[in-house]
């Protein structure tokens, strides 16, 4: 198995509207002989206009060999994804053989934003932002149709959160489906993404399953710019478990600018964000928000 395409920004210059775009992909040679190829990336803006074309180096893989290939380049006049501004680029990645023929290609919708966490604050594109929004059941259903909602209805309901002043949705307990994740990308709504959990920290095989699910969720959703927080559990987890969750993030999403944490984690230094339900409303180190302050259900 391979982990697919990973696209991320680096060397952000918000004022200068510049960012280095990086594209990576795991490639496996399943042929019986060595294969050589080059890795290319093309960037299209929201109107479909080509704004970047990056040529990678030549690679040769032996039979059965797996390697991560990379290409990067500077994007000028960049539009940065932000709250209420879901600007998305299309990145087309391509493997070409030495004779110029196409081996494989992937099209990825993504956006670029700069994040920073620390001193009790969260910065988005060099501006401190106070987190306020909604803790929504991941089913996100509507009366009459339940969870079987069309794409436009996902956009409508998620945009309602933005238009009401919310900049964050904390999905409850389990990872949201791709339609909602992509919808939040479009409407400019920050997401806190859980993997799958119960009401509290667990152990043994149940914890192993949560780790496995977080790995799969990160790989599946790491190109979606609206996901900024990875939630390790509905409530606090142990320091050891927090370190395990961060290790998964560091392995599969080391450059995505996302924080790993959980509610009730303000006393765990290794957590990168925290939150409470009642009474505690500030933090010296961890960015935090009141995660279930108003339980009008």
Where in this protein do the model-derived segments appear?
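Substrate-binding/catalytic cleft of secreted carbohydrate-active enzymes
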Residues: 155-163, 167-297
């Amino acid at each position: 198995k391979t982990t697919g395409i990973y696209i991320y920004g680096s060397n952000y210059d918000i004022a200068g509207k510049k960012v280095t775009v990086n594209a990576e992909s795991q490639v496996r040679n399943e042929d019986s002989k060595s294969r050589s190829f080059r890795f290319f990336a093309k960037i299209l803006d929201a109107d479909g206009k080509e704004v970047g074309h990056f040529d990678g180096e030549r690679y040769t893989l032996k039979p059965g060999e797996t390697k991560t290939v990379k290409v990067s380049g500077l994007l000028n006049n960049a539009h940065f994804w932000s709250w209420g501004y879901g600007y998305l680029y299309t990145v087309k990645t391509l493997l070409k053989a030495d004779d110029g023929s196409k081996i494989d290609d992937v099209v990825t919708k993504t956006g670029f934003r700069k994040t920073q966490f620390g001193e009790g604050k969260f910065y988005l594109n060099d501006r401190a932002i106070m987190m306020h929004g909604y803790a929504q059941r991941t089913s996100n259903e509507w009366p009459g149709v339940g969870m079987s909602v069309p794409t436009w209805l996902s956009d409508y309901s998620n945009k309602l959160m933005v238009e009401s002043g919310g900049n964050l949705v904390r999905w409850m307990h389990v990872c949201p489906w791709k339609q909602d994740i992509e919808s939040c990308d479009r409407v400019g709504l920050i997401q806190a993404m859980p993997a799958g959990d119960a009401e509290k920290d667990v152990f043994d095989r149940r914890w192993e399953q949560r780790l496995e699910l977080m790995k799969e969720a990160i790989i599946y959703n790491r190109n979606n710019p609206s996901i900024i927080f990875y939630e390790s559990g509905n409530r606090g987890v142990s320091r050891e478990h927090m370190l395990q969750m961060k290790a998964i993030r560091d392995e599969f999403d080391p450059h995505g600018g996302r924080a790993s944490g959980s509610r009730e984690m303000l006393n765990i230094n290794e957590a990168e964000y925290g939150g409470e339900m009642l009474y505690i409303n500030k933090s010296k180190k961890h960015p935090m928000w009141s995660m279930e302050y108003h339980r009008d259900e």
